[in-house]
Amino acid sequence: MHAYPQLELWFVVGSQHLYGPKTLRAVAENAQRIVDGLNAEGGLPAKLVLKPTVTESEGILALCREANNAPQCAGLVTWMHTFSPARMWIAGLTALQKPFMQLHTQANIEVPWATMDMDFMNLTQTAHGGREYGFIAARLRKPHEVVVGHWQDPRVQAQLGAWMRVAAAVHDSRSLKVARFGDNMREVAVTEGDKVEAQIRFGYAVNGHSLGDLAAAIEAVTPAQTQDKLAQYEADYELTAAVRAGGAKRGQLLDAARIEIGLQGFLDRGGFKAFTTNFENLHGIPQLPGLAVQRLMQQGYGFGAEGDWKTSALLRAIKVMGNGNGGGASFMEDYTYDFTAGQELVIGAHMLEVCPSIAAEAKPLLDVQPLSIGKKDDPARLIFSAKPGRAIHSTLLDMGNRFRLISHEVDVITPPHDLPQLPVARAVYHPLPDLARGTAAWIHAGGAHHTVFSQGVSIHQLQTFAEMFEIEFVHIGEHTDIGRLKQELRWGDATWR
């Protein structure tokens, strides 16, 4: 089963008429064999669709325009089977508005040493056909991925699949609608940003919506719908005594169920795949949406607290990118430190809104506890710890003259001690290369206090995502050096001046 059954990537093979019809037939046959093989055995997240071999400028331009207008096409996988003079590609690549990559491969693994002749050499020219194609892509300043190796190599298939995931995330972003309930938290800087530029650059359509309309959607939820939702909670989670039937906080859980149903209905009716809330703007809502937000994130919606629409949109993109990949993604905030020498840790959490897709526990704890912030009723929430292992924190910033994506690798651990008095979901981690350097690097780069925490995507995918949108990318990891990082930031300032 494909992770993106509604999408397809077009496999486009370049050649030219110079070699005659026999060679072009062989090119088409090899291309069909490769596409069939990759679809059957490559473990790809989306379907590859073979397009007719392109041999002249007019055909390439027509195909690129067709790709632009095809809603199911997320991008092009291009292969130069023979030499394909790259001036033929100028018009098409200039017009192309979707991601593309070069699969630098051959139909054959080994050279037939005993029988190789010039017919074979003319047919099997990826080695220099791909270089010609690569030059024109570089000359046009067109960002693109290059995957090198035989198409049956598992490494090549994995790289191709990873790139497809990024293309799917970009495709989703181009039509993403973000609903904002309330504005940004008052006086906060980093959650602000240029929504017009974001729509030009990424496609994000970010608009505010009335809390009154959301409250009306919640009020319209029926008792039968609420009871069905409670049955889901009882099947999926460990409920504390306070929220079980007859418990002292059961009423608050009923409110949380109504909020989830009403909120999801509002989002789905409007075609929104991401949203924000703000604890300062809750008029007409009985409690800060906590459980609802957690469950909606697990279903793939993007979310940002305190009006943080950039993090909400980025979370949605990373959810799409990692779909079916075995790792979760969540809204997160670096909250507090443990500075014990040699064991320095960050405790990440938020008031409520951490996605259970990252939970170590099979059945998180569902409880209702007081929340002093927001001045509303005690909210429901899921309580758990994040799975141990490597993770990445990412943040999307508006730097005034460009967007910057920062991704920081961290090692998540099982909390070294119980946290009996902390009634929220959390992640405990070692930043790389260590807390001091990793945190200093993050701060030097302007990294936000809100992040997307992910365990199902790679640094390379996030860098590719930034390249596809032609925005700045900053990587903080095991080999980060503060002096070098500051120099790279200055280079970025010069590049986007």
UniProtKB/Swiss-Prot annotation:
Record GO cellular component, one term: cytosol
Pathway in which this enzyme or protein is active: Carbohydrate degradation; L-arabinose degradation via L-ribulose; D-xylulose 5-phosphate from L-arabinose (bacterial route): step 1/3
Cofactor requirements of the protein: Mn(2+)
Gene3D superfamilies: 3.40.50.10940
Catalytic activity annotation: beta-L-arabinopyranose = L-ribulose
GO term, biological process aspect, one: L-arabinose catabolic process to xylulose 5-phosphate
Assigned keywords, A-Z: Arabinose catabolism, Carbohydrate metabolism, Isomerase, Manganese, Metal-binding
Enzyme class: isomerase
EC number of this enzyme: 5.3.1.4
Positions with a binding annotation for Mn(2+): 306, 333, 350, 450
GO MF assignments: L-arabinose isomerase activity; manganese ion binding
InterPro entries (alphabetical): Ara_Isoase_C, AraA_central, AraA_N, AraA_N_sf, Fuc/Ara_isomerase_C, Fucose_isomerase_N/cen_sf, Lara_isomerase
Cofactor note (record): Binds 1 Mn(2+) ion per subunit.
Pfam families, per the entry: AraA_central, AraA_N, Arabinose_Iso_C
Function: Catalyzes the conversion of L-arabinose to L-ribulose.
Family: Belongs to the arabinose isomerase family.
Protein name per its UniProtKB record: L-arabinose isomerase
